[in-house]
């Protein structure tokens, strides 16, 4: 209007928008046996026990890139779906998985090779899909948790898209018959419909961080969806509902943190799982979770 010419923009600026959800920090699953959990998450998968927090014998935080598994002691909880992991070396992973059999006999532990991934089942039935790094499909990471895929009932995806778009304020997209909900720069919740009967929700949770922490709280609270008030920095909800009619579509606990939470984007230690006392090179103990510049 002032005569200044409008600059042509060669980029789609909306591609850089994350919306209100900026972190998928952890998946929390109770485990009945910390030794077996260590054998699976640390020795078999090659993840890193958090050296600073939860260092006792009744809980373990296992680092995978910028995300974690939280593994408190209790009756086993099973996610109704699959946790996607990126791990840096397929051959080394297979070697670790094979060696871990000796510690995990008599449990549900198993693994199966497939083209492009390895499917792994934890001692209590949780499913992991382990991928090699792939920037085009999984983002520019060499170690991490790019997605959590959840099995849901037929006919629920349109309502779930409305919930995450209208109530939470993040973007969604349909890909290969599944609903992808963006929950961080290169992380997604994936909802995939199934005809298989699903067990009742058993209390496991995922943790997200919201930009509009208070605004989303108000929208959820107006519908009676807040399930727990944890602190000034944190609340929880369980029910995913269709905003159009209030119908409950799915249940999984969402632990929600603000960007002012003391643990938001806390840097995590990741080890190079290829290093052993017999196969060692100084200066190579730490793993880098992100790819170098392209």
Show where each model-derived region lies.
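Conserved active-site tyrosine of GNAT-family acetyltransferases
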Residues: 37-42, 125, 159-167, 220
């Amino acid at each position: 209007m002032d005569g200044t010419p409008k600059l042509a923009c060669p980029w789609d600026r909306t591609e850089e928008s994350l919306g209100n959800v900026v972190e998928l920090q952890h998946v929390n699953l109770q485990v009945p046996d910390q030794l077996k959990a260590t054998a699976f998450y640390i020795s078999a998968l090659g993840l890193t026990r958090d050296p600073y927090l939860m260092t006792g014998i009744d809980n373990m935080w296992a680092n995978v890139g910028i995300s974690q598994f939280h593994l408190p002691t209790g009756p086993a909880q099973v996610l109704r779906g699959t946790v996607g992991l990126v791990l840096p070396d397929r051959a080394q992973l297979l070697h670790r998985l094979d060696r871990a059999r000796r510690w995990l006999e008599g449990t549900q532990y198993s693994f199966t090779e497939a083209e492009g991934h390895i499917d792994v089942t934890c001692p209590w039935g949780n499913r992991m899909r382990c991928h090699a790094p792939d920037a085009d499909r999984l983002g520019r990471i060499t170690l991490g948790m790019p997605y959590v895929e959840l099995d849901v009932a037929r006919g629920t995806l349109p309502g779930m898209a409305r919930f995450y778009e209208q109530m939470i304020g993040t973007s969604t997209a349909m890909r290969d018959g599944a609903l992808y909900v963006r929950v961080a720069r290169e992380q997604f919740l994936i909802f995939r419909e199934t005809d298989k009967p699903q067990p009742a929700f058993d209390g496991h949770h995922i943790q997200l961080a919201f930009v509009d922490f208070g605004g989303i709280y108000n929208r959820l609270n107006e519908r009676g969806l807040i399930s727990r008030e944890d602190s000034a920095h944190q609340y929880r909800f369980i029910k995913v509902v269709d905003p159009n009619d209030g119908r409950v579509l799915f249940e999984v606990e969402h632990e929600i943190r603000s960007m002012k939470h003391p643990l938001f984007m806390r840097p995590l230690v990741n080890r190079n799982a290829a290093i052993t006392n017999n196969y060692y090179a100084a200066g190579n103990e730490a793993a880098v979770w992100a790819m170098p510049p392209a």
